[in-house]
Curated annotation (Swiss-Prot):
<feature type="region of interest" description="Disordered">
    <location>
        <begin position="350"/>
        <end position="379"/>
    </location>
</feature>
<dbReference type="GO" id="GO:0009424">
    <property type="term" value="C:bacterial-type flagellum hook"/>
</dbReference>
<keyword id="KW-1005">Bacterial flagellum biogenesis</keyword>
<dbReference type="InterPro" id="IPR001635">
    <property type="entry name" value="Flag_hook_Flik"/>
</dbReference>
<feature type="region of interest" description="Disordered">
    <location>
        <begin position="172"/>
        <end position="209"/>
    </location>
</feature>
<feature type="compositionally biased region" description="Basic and acidic residues">
    <location>
        <begin position="182"/>
        <end position="197"/>
    </location>
</feature>
<comment type="function">
    <text>Controls the length of the flagellar hook.</text>
</comment>
<dbReference type="InterPro" id="IPR038610">
    <property type="entry name" value="FliK-like_C_sf"/>
</dbReference>
<dbReference type="InterPro" id="IPR052563">
    <property type="entry name" value="FliK"/>
</dbReference>
<protein>
    <recommendedName>
        <fullName>Flagellar hook-length control protein</fullName>
    </recommendedName>
</protein>
<comment type="similarity">
    <text>Belongs to the FliK family.</text>
</comment>
<dbReference type="GO" id="GO:0044780">
    <property type="term" value="P:bacterial-type flagellum assembly"/>
</dbReference>
<dbReference type="InterPro" id="IPR021136">
    <property type="entry name" value="Flagellar_hook_control-like_C"/>
</dbReference>
<dbReference type="Pfam" id="PF02120">
    <property type="entry name" value="Flg_hook"/>
</dbReference>
<feature type="compositionally biased region" description="Low complexity">
    <location>
        <begin position="350"/>
        <end position="369"/>
    </location>
</feature>
Length: 405
């Protein structure tokens, strides 16, 4: 068993060469000096509360003692600065508290309660809301820069924003904008015109009562002129302008149905049968004139005139082509038979190259030309000729009857 010799060391020897040992600026030295400055024998007691004034007084003493003992002013200067900052902060806090108490004293109890509640909410919000760092602010500014710009509303020319929009506070207060002067002027003008109209109507009625009797046309004209002063009436509609439109509408011919077409070969049995059926259809419909188109367009049309009188039919057909007229003559027996089956007897029929109206027109033209020639000859006969009186007397005679003739 090995026994080590007991080493007797002191506190001063252990901390002599170490920088981490107890120095003059340690907390224990500061407390010891502070206790000595406050009282030599600890007169205040261990449980006594230290005030700011006591700290300032102790700081002044400590600074002097430190300078006298060690000659290093660094610790004393630091202590003095700390005490000065604490004193300034305390003075500012006291000033703020004094002002707040003065403001609270001026408020009513209800307002005081509301103010305290608002201050408590603000303090809680400040505690809960963390302060934004520089990085967060930079990110927010970048996001705002990326947002699209809001379009700026350009006011219309001759129009002010005050005329178009009404402020929200004014609406909440119930302040409505006054009517523009132009609208007031318009209303006053309309009232003035209304008064003029009533005055003119009253004047017209007075004139009618006192003066000579006015015709209804004059009274209507006066009322119309009074109404024109207020507002312009619509354009008058004249009957003369409407009559030509009506006459032109009535003068338009009615749409005529297209003539049926005989598509069968000309002169064939099918063609004769189709022709007879078409004529029978005309008689049933009561048509007095009709047209039939032939299949080759070069053949033209067949004009038919039909007259019915007590189940007696008179038929006239016109075609400019000779072979078409021959085909019509060949179809007459079949047509006569079908009419007889329907109880209609074909009395007179004619087929020609000109219509009956054309024949009448040509005959009337011939008669008029003959009459013109006769009138010319008569005019020539009426011309007075120079003849002896004996010849004129012989031509007239003496009124006696010659019994020997």
């Amino acid at each position: 068993m090995i026994t080590l010799p007991q080493l007797i060391t002191t506190d001063t020897d252990m901390t002599a060469g170490l920088t981490s040992g107890k120095t003059t600026g340690s907390a224990e030295d500061f407390l010891a000096l502070l206790a000595g400055a406050l009282g030599a024998d600890g007169a205040q007691g261990k449980d006594a509360r230290i005030t700011l004034a006591d700290l300032q007084a102790a700081g002044g003493k400590l600074s002097k003692e430190l300078l006298t003992q060690h000659g290093e002013p660094g610790q004393a200067v630091k202590l003095a600065d700390l005490l000065a900052q604490k004193a300034n902060a305390t003075d500012e806090t006291l000033t703020d508290l004094t002002q707040a108490q003065h403001l609270l004293s001026t408020l009513t109890p209800s307002l005081k309660t509301s103010a305290l509640a608002a201050l408590s909410k603000t303090a809680q919000h400040d505690e809960k809301t963390p302060a934004l760092s520089d990085e967060d602010l930079a990110s927010l500014s970048a996001l705002f820069a990326m947002l699209p710009g809001q379009p700026v509303a350009t006011p219309v020319a001759g129009e002010t924003p005050a005329e178009n929009h009404i402020a929200l506070p004014s609406l909440l207060r119930g302040d409505m904008p006054s009517a523009p002067q132009e609208e007031t002027h318009t209303l006053s003008f309309s009232e003035h015109e209304k008064g003029k109209t009533e005055a003119s109507l009253a004047r017209a009625s007075d004139d009618r009562a006192t003066g000579p009797a006015l015709t209804p046309l004059v009274v209507a004209a006066a009322a119309t002129s009074a109404k024109v002063e207020v507002d312009s009436p619509p354009a008058p509609v004249t009957h003369g302008a409407a009559m030509p439109t009506l006459s032109s509408a009535t003068a338009q011919p009615l749409p005529v149905a297209s003539a049926p077409v005989l598509s069968a070969p000309l002169g064939s049995h099918e063609w004769q049968q189709t022709f007879s059926q078409q004529v029978m259809l005309f008689t049933r419909q009561g048509q007095q004139s009709a047209q039939l188109r032939l299949h080759p367009e070069e053949l033209g049309q067949v004009h038919i005139s039909l007259k019915l009188d007590d189940n007696q039919a008179q038929l006239q057909m016109v075609s400019p082509h000779s072979h078409v007229r021959a085909a019509l003559e060949a179809a007459l027996p079949m047509l006569r038979t079908q009419l007889a089956e329907s109880g209609i007897q074909l009395g007179q029929s004619s087929i020609s190259s000109e219509s009956f109206a054309g024949q009448q027109q040509s005959s009337s033209q011939q008669q008029s030309s003959r009459a013109q020639h006769t009138d010319a000859f008569g005019a020539e006969d009426d011309i007075a000729l120079a003849a002896p009186a004996s010849l004129q007397a012989a031509a007239r005679g003496n009124g006696a009857v010659d019994i020997f003739a």
